[in-house]
Amino acid sequence: CIRDSSKEELEAAARRQLREILERIYREPPQYDDVIDTLFSKLPAIRDTLDTDVQAAYEGDPAATCREEVMLAYPAFEAISIFRIAHELYLMKVPMLPRMMTEYAHSLTGIDIHPGATVGPYFFIDHGTGVVIGETTVIGEHVKLYQGVTLGAKSFAVKADGTLVK
């Protein structure tokens, strides 16, 4: 029989899993506990922002029958959810993991959002295949994108041979 898990048990399990992921990725580990504590402190704000994203999708897509459908069946919401967590890790300067997370979302959904991009609340991507949002992109509030849109990577300086200056 499966019993209900308490909030504390779920958080402890999530913390253990995140620690295991960090330990597998990094030879020179960051301060695991600091990273985990900081990320968990940001989860309520991430959830609030994701709630605005669900609302934007529900209100912006006539085919959406309910908010639960958006959360469970919309690939774009999955990509945005992963991005929002990866973005916080990126801001915390956690190396590699944020990019791995958004590349995973890209492989699942066809939506490529760099973890360094800035994306405001009430964000919705409808039919998101081929959407690319680069690291330098800044997206405000109440924005809706459709398939095949590329944003960012236009502001880099280039050398005489056409290669990017990093």
Language model region names:
Residues R3-E103:
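Terminal amphipathic alpha-helical/low-complexity segments used for targeting or macromolecular assembly
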Residues H87-K166:
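Flexible, glycine/small-residue-enriched loop-and-beta-strand segment within the central core
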